[in-house]
Amino acid sequence: MLRNIFRLICLMLVLSFSFSIVSCREQVADDDMIDQPIVLNMNTEYKLAENLPEGNGQRVKVILLLGQSNASGSSIVSYLQKNSSKQDFARYSAGYSSVLINYCIDDHNVCSEGEYLPVDLTCGAAEGFFGPEVGMADALAAAYPDETVLILKYTMSGYSLHHHWLSLGQRGSIYNAFLIFAKENMEHLEALGYDARIGAICWMQGESDTTQAKADRYFDNQSAFVSYLREDLEPYAEDGGIYFIDAGISNGPYCEPGYPTVNEAKRRFSELSPLNIYFSTIDAGLTTVNEPEGDPDWGHYDALCELELGRIFAKHVIESYRER
């Protein structure tokens, strides 16, 4: 028991330290390098699934989960267990055989090695942490009990849209690495005989764009970003197009001073197309202030809130399929 507690404390220290370093680094980049290109050396060697049966023409829904650490999964499993009923936690732990996830987190730091695995509580940024895929799977499995849903998760904790997903408004290092991941997996699904279509992109990002200079550019950056996504992924798009489901960021101290500007940019962008969906995590009551008790991790959602984040994503995914 003590060993597990010590391990949890160590993991929290690592994540918190990493978040602080990135935040400080981004402040410097914002002041001194806002209009300078930044190139990351990304690993684009992706393994392809060997655990899927032949598709034989089976139609499958594919959902992309993209963003930074709250998409990676930095919420604490032990608090989810503490605050859930035994029946609910048993369901989350057992996983969802009809909702499979292939994930690459933080440039292969944590990944499924190309395999599609049942979503459970082990798909987060580190051992003992989970992401929004759990709430997504809980809702998607209930909505589509006789179907297989695939989640492709590609996230980079602590990196900005302005400097890293994009660079000077063009496709940047993270975007290009993600695109290889997505294309190779979609082509592999086709080669296995699946009729796989991307129906929605769930985007949980913006915390690292909250220096005011980056926040002021978020609307233009997101407009470019989503146009690239739809252009590059068009061959794999579901009938009716790819929905972009965009979560607002929190109003916690790590999102000062620019979170109102970022969230307003997200809201404005959602008005440009019926395929763009925005929801406010602040209005939804999602908090970052309670866990761990006594020393909260202000950057990441409390466990039940991370679960709800995934459920809200799934709600909009389900509604998007009804509207096609």
Where are these regions (language model features)?
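Cell-envelope and extracellular/periplasmic
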Residues: D30-R324
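C-terminal motif of bacterial Sec signal peptides marking the signal peptidase cleavage site
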Residues: S20-S23
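Bacterial signal peptide processing site
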Residues: R25-Q27
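Intrinsic low-complexity, intrinsically disordered segments enriched in polar/basic residues
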Residues: I5, S18, D30-D32
